[in-house]
Amino acid sequence: IRRLLAVWSAHCIKFACQLTGKQGATLAGKAALTLYPPILGELAREVKEDIFVVCGTNGKTTTNNLLASVLEGNHKKVVCNRTGSNMLNGVASAFVLNAGFSGHLKADYACIEVDEASTVKVFPHFQPDYMILTNLFRDQLDRYGEIDTTMELLAKAMGMAPHMKILANADDSLSAFLALEQENPHAFYGISQQVI
């Protein structure tokens, strides 16, 4: 019954926020996790196919939304945090607000943007099937100090999901290095020819 209460409360909070002109993208998730802490993991287990997470300094929201749009274009039901609310509460909101009033989720896939430092908070709730790593640059220094800190957090999260396949940007040396250093299965993507 706490799970139902958490889902209903999240939907009510989202509705109230919309009435007041606010998004409420993280508040609904925070309330759901407070009322029923295992809700994120339980809903994630109801995803029928794969869970993708997108991490990186730049391009997370665009990459995540493009992936979700491709899947939806193939008539798949997708959980996606399209607004870029990419910390634990925002991730929880994406799942909870896609759950029906029965408290259950009917989704084929999940495409979830996750802030690099939040991966270690999100992955205890569920282990993704894939991580798409866009790039790693120093523009996050204001939040995390050295880029090494960001890489250490990502490496720790990757270790928490040992079967997760890492899809890393081969054109970004830090992303490629990080993927190669892990025991996770990995593959690379990039631009194969000079475009400029």
Label for each model-derived stretch:
Residues 1-53, 72-74, 89-99:
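Short, basic phosphate-binding NTP loop
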Residues 74, 126-127, 181-184:
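Short, structured coil segments at secondary-structure junctions
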Residues 72-73, 129-138:
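Gly-rich Lys/Arg/Thr-decorated short loops/hinges at beta-loop-alpha junctions or inter-strand turns
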Residues 49, 137-196:
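Acidic, Mg2+-coordinating active-site environments of NTP-dependent enzymes
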Residues 51, 108-111, 165:
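Residue-level preference for the first positions of well-ordered beta-strands
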Residues 52, 79, 130-132, 167, ...:
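Hydrophobic/aromatic beta-strand patches that form the interior of the parallel beta-sheet core
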Residues 37-84, 155:
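Walker A (P-loop) phosphate-binding motif
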Residues 90-133:
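Conserved nucleotide-sensing/catalytic segment adjacent to the nucleotide-binding pocket
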